[in-house]
Amino acid sequence: MDLGEFRLHSLGLDKEKFGRIYSFVDFGNVNYWYENDRRKWDNNQLKENQKLIIDIEKLANFISEFSEQKRFYYGWNPRVKRSWHITIKAEKCGFIKNTKPMQFIKHYVGEGVISRDGRATRKDANGTYIEIPKSNFDVEISVDAIRLLEKYDSFCLFSGDSDFTYLANYLKKNKKKFIVIASGQVFHTLKELADLYINAQNVKGLIASIKETSPL
């Protein structure tokens, strides 16, 4: 057993048990897994000017160790140039990508209200509002999962979103195994349906990198 096989075995990713695995990455969810982490994968403290980010190349390499196909779903922000670069990077790393521009939904608030997450308020003829970014891929992932149903034995989801519960039930009824890799905030029913649940903290060193932040 080589190092890669040992790593997969320790995570519970047994190829004999799960057969052909297809992985579906909801990157809008994955991208924030370690946003508030202040410790590295070796449990040492990050420096003040450091933060953890998802490393798309490392993510692709990790998935390729156990998955026959890797698919990447991401809503890019037309207002942020780097956002589009994420989709380019994913494609270069061998992901089959499904992308669309992010939508911004107006949410009207009372006069003088301050957004908790620091979003700027705007005004139009109907009043004061904040813009909430929205880019769900539960429909696209579900359609692809069903369309490709006969090609895999196990469906691996990188997300803990409750929107995937119905899909999980469908896959289980069709004799497919269901793997969930997600952060601590996982919808409990989704976790219960999983044949294997892997906490994102257990793969931190395999899919994350340290980024130096600019001084204020």
Spans of features found by a protein language model:
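Nuclease catalytic cores that cleave nucleic-acid phosphodiester bonds
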Residues: 96-216
